[in-house]
Amino acid sequence: MEDYQSRWINGEEIAGVRECADRYEIIRKYAERFDRPFTVLDIGANYGYFSIRLMEDFDCVSVMGECVPQYFEELTRLVDANGCDKGIVFKHRFSQHSLRQLAEVEHFDLVLAMSIVHHIDGDVNETIRLIRNLGDHTIIEVANENNACGQKQVKTTAIGEDWQHLGIGKSHLATSVRDIYAMQQTRTRFDRRYIGCPEGLVAGHRLDSNDNSKTISFDHKSESRDWIPGINLVTFKHYGGIYPTNDRLEETLILMDPPKLPHGDIRPWNLIISGHDLHLIDAADPNHTQITDDAKSIDGVINWLSSGRWSA
């Protein structure tokens, strides 16, 4: 297996077969629009070159998905070696189904799909549409070579007029280059509260997001607050989260400062993971049923992390 991306370790680059620095500069310039903390999804992250550098340069959480063992094992090592305490790694091969399901429950500020859509089965333009639905901003790099993998996808990719051409990335195939595009859109509603929630449980929350602020409000209560960068802990588990490790998350739960008032509903789906940090949400929700005291509930979440079964 080739070293596709370069490795980035504490400010130094070890070159892989793909040029990365120039492509990162395109991404970095685009990300400068954010005047707030933001969340990145890096689909097919490989060695996490772009995400690791984004976390160095900006106040962001980056969620990196990779399915190849050589790559995700090295990815987790690199995230740790660079001290990226806002890094999240999935061991997951994205499909159209998993992209669609992810968009039902999560919202990302910046989605990176760098030379990846031709590796995903199915109609490539449907794949692009599903990736667009994941957040406000999407950057995509498109393969075009006759000897690239996934020729059916390569030859049928259509980039619409609503995409902005940002530049080109030098390919690893012969002397060709690949076009890099960006697209912006706004989404305010979710289809589900969390993965696996009971059918008929209405999401009931609204997102207001721009480059300067991001807030969440609720249909059934008066609370409105800043969006917490990261993803739901249930999403992390469902998509094969391997970094931070379970041991690290258990330690975070044990050391977590107790809420000022009893929460009453500490469950996996009421926790947001922002890398090494975990944040409780939905305290004092008038619609929830108090299940047990908070200390026992935290023990229940710790057991769930290792077993995948919620029994508190």
Spans of features found by a protein language model:
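Conserved beta-strand signature within the Rossmann-like core of class I S-adenosyl-L-methionine
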Residues: 135-146
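A conserved beta-strand element that flanks and buttresses the S-adenosyl-L-methionine
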Residues: 112
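A short, conserved alpha-helix within the catalytic core of class I
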Residues: 119-130
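Catalytic-loop of the protein kinase fold
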Residues: 260-268
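C-lobe/activation-segment region of protein kinase-like
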Residues: 275-312
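Conserved structural core of kinase catalytic domains
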Residues: 216-247
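Conserved N-terminal segment of class I S-adenosyl-L-methionine
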Residues: 1-36, 41-105, 179, 189-220, ...
